[in-house]
Curated annotation (Swiss-Prot):
Organism: Neurospora crassa (strain ATCC 24698 / 74-OR23-1A / CBS 708.71 / DSM 1257 / FGSC 987)
GO biological process: translation
Gene Ontology molecular function terms on file: structural constituent of ribosome
Family matches, as NCBIfam families: rpsL_bact
Protein name from the UniProt record: Small ribosomal subunit protein uS12m
SUPFAM superfamilies: Nucleic acid-binding proteins
Amino acid sequence: MATTFLRNLFSQAQPSLLRRPLMPSSSSILPAAARLFSSTPAQNATLNQVMRGCRKPQRARHAVSPALSSIKSPALKGVCVKVGITRPKKPNSGERKTARVRLSTGKVITAYIPGEGHNISQHSVVLVRGGRAQDCPGVRYHLVRGALDLAGVATRMSSRSKYGTKKPKKASVG
């Protein structure tokens, strides 16, 4: 089996593999336009590397927000099952407001409530988007402020669009 593989490998149109120069010439340093920004020449896998299985495809990354990415939806509606707090991971301290939400697909997830203060309670209808809370374990979703039953942050002046706050009215002079 291995001898047949080796015979086919070297007998076809690859005699240059046996007579490869020790140092690459200046013409072989940039073999393709795809390698223009690389500082080293492209190297093919050796026979031992191929036999070990180096040409397996890379595994796909896991989804950050699997309940949304599995149905390819940017946001989903859900009903709050429980509202509570979560303690953040080690270097941080505080209380992060979270909610357990039953999505319209039937899955129950934990979502972070952004901003200061909120008005949701059990049975509130909320809109859930992807994106994890980096210092809260198991929290892979955010609630959208200013959508459905979750009101925007009332006193917010900067980054208002992220917190569902309307532009404040200008005070009229006179």
